[in-house]
Amino acid sequence: MSDCIFCKIVAGEIPCDKVYEDKEILGFKDINPKGPVHVLFIPKKHYATLNDIPSSDLSVVGKIFWVIQKVAKEQGVAESGYRTLINTNRNSGQIVFHVHWHLIGGKPLGPMA
């Protein structure tokens, strides 16, 4: 999608601080981190929200969760704890409409509001 900032990152048009990449998934550090570790994971294929991923592409969702736990170990937060989060649509706070998972850790996060 031409106006999607995450699609531009996937295409290499906008730089990112990459922590993981394979043919389907990209993981990179959030530019406005909510903790010492804050990584975003996106499917390289554009889906605006979680609601838009068809059942034929569900394997990428499972793979993203596997990648999140791998990167949590690499970033040193797997044992102390981390949060995974997906915002879906405006009322949840989704700002970039390319589905993405947050991995946040490195400090006590407390309960969700």
Regions found by a protein language model. Give the residues of each.
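HIT superfamily nucleotide-processing domains
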Residues: M1-A113
